[in-house]
Amino acid sequence: VAAPVSPVVDARPSAPAPVPQPITVSRFAAGQALNVRRHLDALRDFRRDEFGDSIARPTAGHIHAVNSLLGQLRTPLDRAVHVLEQAAGSPSTDAMASRAETLLTAKSRAHDWVRATEKVWDFYFELFGQRQSAFGVWLVSCDRIALDCYQHVFMHLGQPRSIPSPPPFAYMRTGFSPATYRRGIPLRKLGRQSNPFPLVQLPYHRLVNPWTMGAILHEVSHNLQNELDLQSEVPAAIVHRLGSAGAPREAQLIWARWNREIFGDMLGLLLGGEAFVASLLDVIGRAPEQVLDYSPRGVHPTPYLRAKLSFHLLSSMGFDDVAQHYAAVWHRLYPNTSTHTMPAQLFDTAERAIPLVVEAVVGTKFVGLGRKSLREVIFFEPRHQVMIEEAAQRLASGIDPGVIPERFLIGAVRVAVDRGLAEPETLMRNFYLELSRR
């Protein structure tokens, strides 16, 4: 039997246990100053190359605009950090309570600015980060449609205006309707800081079905109304036109309250043509109780009337047969209007008011347009629809559609899917392929 092995005993003296260092105000202060200084340093400017090298990455203009906003926020943050560092480095005195209060106040202010700045930094980090995802090409395609709309409008104004920069930026948000956030408005998601460029929010279900993307034209039109200083001129024109025709005062004010959504539809139709109407009906064609329901504080026209505005404008653009067809379908879908909840002064005068409202929006010569009317700045004629239909055939065949404007590709893919020229998946792929290579 083997002898038991004796354990090896380490004859070296054991190391003394670490002695906890007492927490002092000075150590606490130094730690807080270090933390917020590192927070400040981490909230640095963005670089364009950190979002990849594809065509989908943010433009230099978008990066610069966000960095300028971050720079504005870092100035008070830097001051707050400096105050905290001074408080942390001040010598101990007998008035410890006073020193602690000064320190804690400085710490709280610095952290408030850290949170405010980081909220903005995080928002744009996630926004720009979408461009590195599988949806990057889709989003930059939407950017190019929006840019085409802006360029076309600003090229045809009656007088020169300062060029807006940077252009709109599209991003995806699932589970929501299309929306937009205008340049220069305070945003809650930015801590009430001003938005440096227009944002166009698009849901996934629209992006995957680009023939429903008339929403881009509508949302971009909201931005253009403000970029062109028409936010007051348009409702005033509506009230004036209706008042001159003897419309009831209540009806005048309701139509004026709806001016932004009406303008978005009218300009969207002038930009995109008849496919815009089809896309609009996709959205507002719902159950009768929804289509006929009036919202006393709503900014959207009651859907039943909203569709008729577009039918009237489409007819005046030279598409009378198409407009009559849409109107006939609309009336077959909603033959009974007896359950509507609209005020009598609005509903009973609507048929007379609709042409007046449309003319007020597209026919008034606005100062913001260089004393031109909207239909003089933007127009869509039957010849443009011929271009769209030719482009639809090319998209379906995977052929380069040529020099057609980006915004017309929405109509082209709509025609192609409605006529079954190719499988929807093929049309979606070709739509984004064409826009992404421009």
What do these predicted regions represent?
Residues 200-216, 255:
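Short pre-active-site segment immediately N-terminal to the catalytic Zn-binding motif
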Residues 142, 213, 260:
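Hydrophobic (often cysteine-bearing) scaffold residues that line and stabilize catalytic clefts
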Residues 211-231, 265:
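Active-site recognition of the HExxH zinc-binding catalytic motif
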Residues 19, 23, 245-316, 320:
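Metalloprotease/metallohydrolase-associated module, dominated by Zn2+-dependent proteases
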Residues 2-140, 144, 148-149, 165-170, ...:
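Non-catalytic terminal regions of proteins
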Residues 121-122, 193-198, 237-247:
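Short, conserved phosphate-binding/catalytic loop or strand-edge motifs used
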Residues 160-164, 232-242, 277-286:
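Short, glycine/acidic-rich hinge or "gate" loops at secondary-structure transitions
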Residues 164-198, 225, 229-236:
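Active-site-adjacent "gating/activation" loops or surface patches in catalytic cores
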